[in-house]
Amino acid sequence: MTVSKAVECDEVYGIAGHKGRPEVVKKKGRQGRRRRLKGKGGRGTLEKERPPVFGMIQRGGQVVINLLANVQQKMIEPVIKATIVPGTRVYTDEYSIYAHLQRWGYAHKSVNHGQGEFARDDDGDGVCEVHVNTMERFWSLLRSWLRPHRGISQEKLPLYLGFFEFVHNVRKRGKALLPALIELLVT
């Protein structure tokens, strides 16, 4: 699936351990999770059991999410190039992995969350065009949907993410959902 027009990119760090697999936990040389266990600081990776989920959402349209081993420019570049049409306006936060978007052929604008900037009006018409609030809203919906599952295995996380992406992308189809589901199963 490709997205175009105005696209927002962002990353979120989930919690996905080795639920139901105590042998994997012991192999890593640590005790099982305990309530209120303080984690390590910094950004997440699969090894730290804080897998990064990278998302791209077209404003008013489709979303594409990918589970990554870590978040680096070399990891997101092929994902972005395969998903976003060149020349598209891409909105991000200030994270340095997005620094080369213009070099890759995209019109890039960013907001600086670290400075308290969450939306910006660049053309003075009173509408804040530069923001990643659509993607942040999607992450909020995803977290709310995952919360009742009370922990997810790293092995199953891609299935949960794929299902939620599918549900989000077909939510407006109504009766056309069945043909879309059949098409997905056939391909």
What are these regions (language model features)?
Residues M1-T187:
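Residue-level recognition of single "structural anchor" positions
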